[in-house]
C-alpha cells in the first residue's frame, strides 16, 4: 500500500509540472496572439484593396494578352502552403493539410512550403517542392514575401505551372480558424471563382494602359497575398495553440483532483488497516 501511495504522489508531482508548462505556453500564446491579431487586421484592408484593383482591371480588359490574366493551357498547380513551425496547436496543421489534399486531389501539382511543418509534410509524402528556403514561417519578412512572389512569377512565365493557389488558415476569431484555398493566378481563375461576375468598383483610367499596370503590380499583388496569408495563419496558429494549452491545463487540473482523491482514499485505508492491526494485537494480549 505504501509503495502504491508513493507512486501516486510522484504521479501528482509529474502532472503538476506538466500543468505549469502548459499554463506558461498558454500565457505566451495569449501575449503573442494580441500582436498577431492586430497585425492581421491592419494588413487585411490593403491586400483586399489590391486584390479588388486587379479584378477591376481584369474585368475591364478581358482581351489582355498578359500571361497573368488569360487562362493557362498548363494544368499544373503550385500551392503556396503556409503551416506552422511547431506542434502543440490542436488540429491547426492537420486541418490545413486536409484542406490541401481535398483541393489537390486528382491534380498535377507542386508546393512552395512556408513553415517547418509544411516542409516535413512534403518530405514524408514525397511531394515536389518548388523550394524549401522559406522553412521557418516565424522568420519570414516582407522582403521574403517579395522574393517568393518574384520566384512564382518567373516560374509561371516559364510555364513550370499554370495556376497558383494559396493554402492558409483564415483567422475568424479566437475560437474559429478556417483553412482555405485561394486562387491567385491567373486572373481567369479568379473570374471563374466569382462566377464571371466581377463588378467594376470605380471608373479608373490606368496609364500608360491597364495591361502595363497589371503586369507591374502582379508581383506586389502576390507578395501582398502571401504576407497577408502569413499574418492570418500566424494569428490562427497562436489562437489554436492557446486553446489547446488551455484544454491541456484544464485536463491536468482534473487529473490532479482525481489522483488526490485516490491518494487520500489509499491513505485512509492504510491508516484504518494500521488501527485494526493495533486493536487486534491489543486484544491478543
What are the functions of these language-model segments?
Residues 1-285:
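C-terminal beta-strand-loop-alpha-helix "lid" module of Rossmann-like NAD(P)-dependent dehydrogenases
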Amino acid at each position: 500500500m505504501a509503495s502504491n501511495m508513493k507512486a501516486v504522489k510522484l504521479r501528482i508531482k509529474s502532472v503538476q509540472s506538466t500543468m505549469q508548462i502548459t499554463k506558461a505556453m498558454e500565457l505566451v500564446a495569449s501575449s503573442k496572439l494580441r500582436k498577431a491579431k492586430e497585425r492581421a487586421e491592419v494588413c487585411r484592408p490593403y491586400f483586399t484593396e489590391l486584390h479588388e484593383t486587379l479584378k477591376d482591371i481584369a474585368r475591364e480588359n478581358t482581351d489582355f494578352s498578359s500571361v497573368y490574366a488569360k487562362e493557362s493551357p498548363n494544368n499544373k498547380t503550385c500551392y503556396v502552403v503556409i503551416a506552422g513551425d511547431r506542434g502543440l496547436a490542436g488540429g491547426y496543421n492537420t486541418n490545413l493539410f486536409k484542406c490541401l489534399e481535398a483541393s489537390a486531389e486528382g491534380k498535377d501539382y507542386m508546393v512552395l512550403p512556408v513553415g517547418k511543418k509544411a516542409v516535413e509534410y512534403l518530405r514524408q509524402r514525397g511531394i515536389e517542392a518548388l523550394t524549401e528556403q522559406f522553412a521557418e514561417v516565424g522568420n519570414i519578412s516582407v522582403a521574403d514575401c517579395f522574393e517568393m512572389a518574384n520566384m512564382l512569377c518567373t516560374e509561371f512565365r516559364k510555364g513550370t505551372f499554370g495556376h497558383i493557389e494559396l493554402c492558409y488558415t483564415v483567422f475568424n476569431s479566437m475560437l474559429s480558424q478556417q483553412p482555405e484555398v485561394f486562387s491567385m493566378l491567373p486572373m481567369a481563375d479568379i473570374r471563374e471563382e466569382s462566377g464571371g461576375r466581377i463588378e467594376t468598383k470605380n471608373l479608373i483610367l490606368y496609364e500608360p494602359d491597364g495591361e502595363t499596370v497589371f503586369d507591374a503590380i502582379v508581383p506586389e499583388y502576390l507578395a501582398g497575398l502571401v504576407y497577408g496569408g502569413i499574418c492570418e495563419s500566424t494569428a490562427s496558429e497562436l489562437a489554436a495553440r492557446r486553446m489547446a494549452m488551455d484544454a491541456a491545463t484544464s485536463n491536468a487540473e482534473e487529473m490532479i483532483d482525481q489522483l488526490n482523491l485516490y491518494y487520500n482514499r489509499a491513505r485512509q485505508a492504510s491508516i484504518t488497516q494500521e488501527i485494526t492491526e493495533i486493536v487486534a494485537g491489543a486484544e491478543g494480549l
